[in-house]
Amino acid sequence: MKDFKKLYFAIIIILFLSLNSCSKTKTAYLPYETAKNINSILVLPFEICSENSESFFYCPVREVISGYVEPSAKETLNRLLKKILSNYSSHYNFIFLSENEFENIISQILEETKNPAEIIKELCKKTNTQGVLYGRIYRFIERKGSSFSIVEPASVAFALVLYDGETGKILWMEEFYETQKPLSENILNIKLYGKLKWLSAEELAERGLIKIFKTFPLK
């Protein structure tokens, strides 16, 4: 039995290394005519998807199922996003709005228009930016248990959208939705999970951000 376990983990490690070496994502770039006009990007605080609240941002997600969102989800994802974006500071200047700053600006804009594209344009005008990065949280459920033994796994779902400040149109969008599963159900998930343990919701969200930002368009 011990020899079998050693063989099992050896196979997992080999698969993990081979997946890392064979699946390099090609860097995405904005079209020149668009990229030359974008120097600063306004980063909005994450918004929670709720049946009871109205969103003024167009976010055409395809397969995401909404669920419970932990009270700490917004703060956690805002912090993780800021950390990820620091890797792209040589390409763009990121302007981060606090919740209060965003509410003050958006309330002024909504007095004039509720058109999603026009809202994007006005946000950029008021902040002297050329693009807007918007995030929406659909699900953020903490695991029940420890990293080695769980009752229920962590489950996270969110989307990020980059809008062009000149036209209000979407330049880039990615969504991430994942409920951690045992590696015995899908060995390919070892690349996402990274370790042979049960992740917290924050750890799963951070891995999700790293994954989707592999396609973030540069200039």
Stretch-by-stretch model annotation:
Residues 1-9:
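Bacterial N-terminal signal peptides that target proteins for export
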Residues 22-53, 123-127, 139, 150-219:
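C-terminal/domain-edge helix-coil "capping" segments
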Residues 10-18:
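Bacterial N-terminal signal peptides
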Residues 2, 147-150:
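Short proline/glycine-enriched turn/loop segments at secondary-structure junctions
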Residues 47-136, 165, 169-173, 202-203, ...:
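N-terminal segment of the mature soluble domain
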Residues 27-28, 118-120, 143-145:
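Short structured motifs
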Residues 104-106, 140-145:
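Short, solvent-exposed loop/turn segments at secondary-structure junctions
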Residues 66, 70, 108, 145, ...:
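Residue-level detector of alpha-helix boundaries and kinks
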